């Protein structure tokens, strides 16, 4: 999935197996309808693991190589992102490409039973659209949300949903849809998707940092999630980024919660002298109003400070800055870089980061990527 199309020779070298062993394994997968042979594209090498140097195979010099790749239309999956106000859902193929439109339903009642009913409807909507387009019926559902999930099944902490007790969401959805269902942290899902199908492919380590309704962070090493029991409690949100910044609800002065929408709205209200929402701030920032622009620059410097802290401690190859409010980072990119440079050694390598456009469909796709990862084991 990560590197296809890829030759058997290259695959054998990556895995440290003999070509004979790889041929036997891939023959079984071809027979099972999981992968297929395809001509290798000329003059265009696909992504490979960082630092991997392919050894020359003189025995096959001059012969056209045949590549192997996952059969994209062999399976389909449904992915969903649960937000505080709505659920977004898409269907994807076996290589994580979105194959339907993004279906959205508003959450008017956040009780688990009502949310499951919405999930069932969205699963049906995505499945029907995929099947009408000739794709196979989805074989699994992946659902992501901001919170703490145990064993991919039970939601024990979901602050935006206000659930007062653990919810066995996986069991409830499986019973409602008849499909295997996994429940995942939303930030973890983004980083898994990036390492399977996106900018994290082949890298030794990769970070996703998000800000919007909250502040989130997830890290992979060698393509695998770095996990600990407490990681999804929003721990990155209370790292100091500005000693003169506003206090969060926990009383911390200048912690990373100042990057959240509510904190930005409160700070902007104080600056302009009357109550303002985050949407008011965003509108004024887009209109280049001086007071909003000043807060954009301050916010981006704070974000750069957080990025530098993460880069210095986790030492990732790349950081993806995402979230519904990540557009702010594009408005103040120079201040973001200044914040990074202020807390980065002058001789250290520049921090490699990217800021993709926000789209809830991509968050839903990321949940589907978790389902794919679970499906293939």
Show which residues each predicted segment covers.
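Glycine/GP-enriched mid-protein hinge/lid loop-to-helix segment characteristic of carbohydrate kinases
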Residues: 101-103, 110-115, 164-165, 169-283
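Short glycine-rich anion-binding loops that position phosphate/pyrophosphate groups of nucleotides
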Residues: 146-149, 212-214, 325-326
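Short glycine-aspartate micro-motif
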Residues: 67, 77-81, 138-142, 206-210, ...
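Glycine-rich phosphate-binding loop and adjoining helix at the ATP-binding site
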Residues: 98-205, 331-342
């Amino acid at each position: 999935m990560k590197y296809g199309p890829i030759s058997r020779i290259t695959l054998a070298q990556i895995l440290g197996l003999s070509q004979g062993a790889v041929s036997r394994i891939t023959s079984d997968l071809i027979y099972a309808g999981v992968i297929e042979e395809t001509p290798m594209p000329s003059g265009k090498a696909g992504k490979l693991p960082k630092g991997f140097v392919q050894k020359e195979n003189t025995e096959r010099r001059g012969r056209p190589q045949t590549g192997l790749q996952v059969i994209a239309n062999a399976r389909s999956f449904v992915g969903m992102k649960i937000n505080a106000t709505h659920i977004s859902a898409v269907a994807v193929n076996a290589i994580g490409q979105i194959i339907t439109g993004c279906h959205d339903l508003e959450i008017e009642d956040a009780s688990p039973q009502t949310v499951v009913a919405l999930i069932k409807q969205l699963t049906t909507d995505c499945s029907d659209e995929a099947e009408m387009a000739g794709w196979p019926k989805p074989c699994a559902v992946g659902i992501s949300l901001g919170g703490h999930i145990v064993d991919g099944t039970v939601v024990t902490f979901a602050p935006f949903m206000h659930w007062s007790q653990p919810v066995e969401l996986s069991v409830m959805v499986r019973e409602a849809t008849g499909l295997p269902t996994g429940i995942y942290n939303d930030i973890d899902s983004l980083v898994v998707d990036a390492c399977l199908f996106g900018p994290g492919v082949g890298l030794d380590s990769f970070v996703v940092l998000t800000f919007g309704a909250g502040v989130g962070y997830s890290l992979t090493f060698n393509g695998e999630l770095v996990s600990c029991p407490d990681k999804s409690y929003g721990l990155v949100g209370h790292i100091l980024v500005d000693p003169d910044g506003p206090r969060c609800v926990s009383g911390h002065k200048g912690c990373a919660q100042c990057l959240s929408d509510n904190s930005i709205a409160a700070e902007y209200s104080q600056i302009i002298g009357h109550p303002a929402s985050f949407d008011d701030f965003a509108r004024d920032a887009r209109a280049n109003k001086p007071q909003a622009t000043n807060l954009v620059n301050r916010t981006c410097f704070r974000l750069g400070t957080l990025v530098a802290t993460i880069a210095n401690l986790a030492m990732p190859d790349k950081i993806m800055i995402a979230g519904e409010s990540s557009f702010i980072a594009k408005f103040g990119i120079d201040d973001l870089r200044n914040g990074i440079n202020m807390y980065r050694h002058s001789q250290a390598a520049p921090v490699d980061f990217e800021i993709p456009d926000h789209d809830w469909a991509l968050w839903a796709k990321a949940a589907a990527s978790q389902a794919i990862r679970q499906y293939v084991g």
